[in-house]
Amino acid sequence: MAITDWPENERPREKLLTRGTAALSDAELLALFLRVGMRGKSAVDLARDLLQQFGSLTRLCAASAAEFSAIPGMGLAKYAQLQAVMELARRALAEQMNDADVFESPLAVRNWLRLRIGSLPHEVFHVLLLDARNRLIEAVELFRGTLTQTSVYPREVVKLALARNAAAVILAHNHPSGAAEPSPADELLTRSLKQALELVDIRVLDHFIVTAHAQPLSFAERGLL
């Protein structure tokens, strides 16, 4: 049955407009993005197929162009639209961090990190460079590694922070395995970076471990800084 044949109060668009986004299921929200279905399937049916195929919204949004386009009814145009939506979300969160003290919007920092690096299949190390008022100057991917290790050199982090005239930094890296617990190597790296940056009067405010399906783990909250 086409969505236009549904009772008006059950159609995703009408439901969103009258009851808000929280009233919609993942499939209904995705159907609004898809707009149309395909022969024999409504947009909601197609959305359910996509979620079943990828297993979650996170994996769907992290799919490659080839993986996404392999699904019947999808293609490069839809893939480009999805990536544009994701990038708009990242930029909106980055604006919040640019305009205010990051401690006034800690959820924005966490959400930005999850969107940026949470679903990557390889490990990356990011440095968020902050000014004296803890506003974001720039976020930089400094190193990229394998699934199990990445090479992070304190001198490169210090060099970057000085070049951008940063007063403080937030460190972040992802665990593609999905386990957010810090390893002994993670703790050692954090101490090394903090000590190196302290020598040039740059504060390390936090270090986050980011995964796809959980809130980033904060070293500061764990008492590991």
UniProtKB/Swiss-Prot annotation:
Task: Give all cystine bridges in this chain.
Answer: none
User: By its UniProt entry, which PROSITE patterns does this protein fall under?
Assistant: MPN, UPF0758
- Which residues participate in Zn(2+) binding? H173, H175, D186
List residues of the MPN domain. Answer: 102-225
**What are the protein's GO molecular function terms?**
metal ion binding; metallopeptidase activity
User: What name does the UniProt record give this protein?
Assistant: UPF0758 protein AZOSEA04420
Family classification: Belongs to the UPF0758 family.
Please name the Pfam families in this protein's record. RadC, UPF0758_N
List the PANTHER family.
Answer: DNA REPAIR PROTEIN RADC, UPF0758 PROTEIN YEES-RELATED
Q: Which UniProt keywords apply?
A: Hydrolase, Metal-binding, Metalloprotease, Protease, Zinc
